[in-house]
Amino acid sequence: MPAALTRRSAMALSAVCLSCLMFGLEISSIPAILPTLERKLHADFKQLQWIMNAYTIAVTTVLMATGTLADRYGRKRIFMIATAAFGVTSLSCGVTENVLTLIVARFLQGLSGGAMLICQIAVLSHQFQGGRERATAFGWWGVIFGIGLGFGPIIGGAIAALLSWTWVFLIHVVFAILAILLAIGGIQESRDPKAGSLDLAGMLTLSLSVFCLAFYITQGPDLGFGSATGLTILGAAIASLIAFLIAEKVSPRPMFDVLVFRIPAFSGAVVGSAAMNISFWPFMIYLPIWFQAGLGYDSVTAGLALLAYTVPTLVMPPLGERLSLRYRPGVVIPAGLFTIGAGFMLMKLGSAAAQPDWLTMLPGCLIAGIGLGLTNTPVTNTTTGSVTSDRAGMASGIDISARMVSLTVNIAVMGFLLASGVLAHLEDALPDSPDAGELWPLAERIAAGNAVSVPGLPEAVVHEALAQGFGWVMLYGGIGVWALAGVSFVIFRTRSLQPAE
């Protein structure tokens, strides 16, 4: 820790960094153990998706509300409560022996994690107000967050191999206790006497809309996308979204001030946030399945292979920021997104090789990671820098919410495409195969990485089916991020519909 910081400030920064390490690890380490959870807890493919989506939906639910609560009741107090809750819910995740209980515990963990994330920013913003100290604090916060995200796969895989999958969750109990002890002596309490009221209507309608859409996509094959039940759920998602927009328009203190979307730089950057989560981050949920079930690697080797995908996201942001200052975010953000898409197309080619392995996947993984690293920092800085200082907190909340919402939806979309690609190959490869409805459960088992326990099905057919499914997902990720790169590029070049105050 830099010597320039006082002892109390160093303790506060250490507490915040420990909590952001926990949050980052819970996003990136869990994908590495999904194949293990499938075996140990007998989780099916949909349940694996909900283990991830329960967390992201919960984070989205609590993000904006926590900022208001922290301003009103004390940022230190809410930070400590959220961190303690994260430790307790992590303990619940680690001791469960039932997948449904794990999904519920993951939702509760996401609520506490989202609250913890917002409090981290609030604590740092208040405690480190000098220019140099502030830069140091946020610099360390970003580095530790990046380590959690970038090295999470290998950390999760190593813990699962050396100890047990349960310790991927239980380790956070230790971190949470340390963070709370540091926070007690280090973080200064602060409040905002002008804190507004909670936007409960906005919070609930947005969360309901995201949940219903994710549920419709994930459970649609079983319910029937065109069935009365399926259409009712889809209708609820649309109605909730409309209700959210109305609530934000009439609320005196909305979570989302829709007027900021009239600022092209802000809107273009938010599209960039969504684009990263239509491709890069949701695919990290499924890539360990390909490395383990498709390429035959164990959890540690799969985690090492994933470093090619994640490490560039740690080393490229400084270059992305320099390029943004030189060529403008409106050029760098779409270019970074285009690079991610190129990486996905190369991964698709690598997975379709006659004998695919980590070397055939390496170029695409590296290029996708480089593209993410070039894009992420300019997106964050542009969303907050394109609005006035009094709107910066709201702009940051919209940015994070856009990431979480698009991540949640695209975890479901990629899962559906993966299973659909597997199903399409099975229908072509198996003579006299039953109809799609009967083959769908088998396709989901293969998509979950459960290829070994498919009796009577040639191993080559299983592998080819899995490869086709992942090919569909990579194609979707590449085309999707390219499309949004084009949208972002166009938006950046439109005239502002209102002055960027």
Task: Enumerate the language-model features and the residues they cover.
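Transmembrane-helix bundle of Major Facilitator Superfamily
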Residues: M1-G185, Y327, K348
